[in-house]
Regions:
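Extended, histidine- and acidic-residue-enriched regions that form the cofactor-binding/catalytic faces
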Residues: 1-111, 117-180
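Single conserved hydrophobic/aromatic residue that forms the stacking wall/gate
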Residues: 178, 185-188
Length: 188
């Protein structure tokens, strides 16, 4: 069975793919998530989601996962050490360029899977521009943190102050990675 990951395949294997595959393009960010989580938390969460999806649907062959674009647009975190960020214009242009090349190669179905709240609008703009340039392209935008019932599982206090690096993201990260949050900060 072929890998579900584009970057695991050879050029010859990619050339034989059906052009009606759904290409999942993961978007994350490298930024601070408090003193207890790694700067790559957004990517770790997406990797966990994608690996869970693959395990749940191992025989589903309609999709292929593209490499994660892990350096996102996170200017709101630039004052924190460890943040790697592109400015908004360059980031949007980069997305359009990558997906545009795939459209030229006749891929037409995409899922933008995002794990950084600060780039939702960037993906909206990029998707709109791609659809206007390349006809018959379908793009579904999904954000792991915006699902039905989301507000019911997060403590009200956390919703007031934002869940970035909070209990919600910490729980998901620890669950998927089996890493322990830095206990000294959490006073465990």
């Amino acid at each position: 069975m072929l890998s579900k990951f584009w970057s695991d395949l050879t050029s010859a294997a990619i050339s034989k793919l059906g052009k009606n595959k759904i290409l999942i393009l993961p978007f994350s960010s490298v930024e601070q998530h408090g003193e207890h989580l790694p700067s790559g938390t957004d990517k770790l969460i997406l990797d966990g989601i994608l690996n869970t999806f693959i395990k749940k649907y191992p025989k589903l062959n309609k999709y292929l996962i593209l490499p994660n674009i892990s350096i996102g647009s996170a200017s709101e975190h630039n004052s924190f050490e460890g943040t790697l960020s592109s400015n908004s214009t360059n980031y949007i242009d980069y997305i359009i360029s990558i997906v545009g090349e795939l459209c030229i190669r006749r891929y037409k179905k995409f899922i933008f899977l995002n794990s950084h709240g600060g780039q939702i609008s960037h993906l909206d703009i990029a998707a709109k521009e791609i659809k206007s340039r390349y006809k018959a392209v379908d793009i579904v935008k999904a954000h792991y943190f915006l699902f039905k019932g989301f507000e019911k599982i997060i403590p009200k206090k956390e919703l007031l102050y934002g869940y970035h690096g909070g209990e919600f993201e910490t729980s998901i990260t620890v669950s998927y990675t089996h890493l322990r949050a830095h206990e000294t900060v959490l006073d465990l």
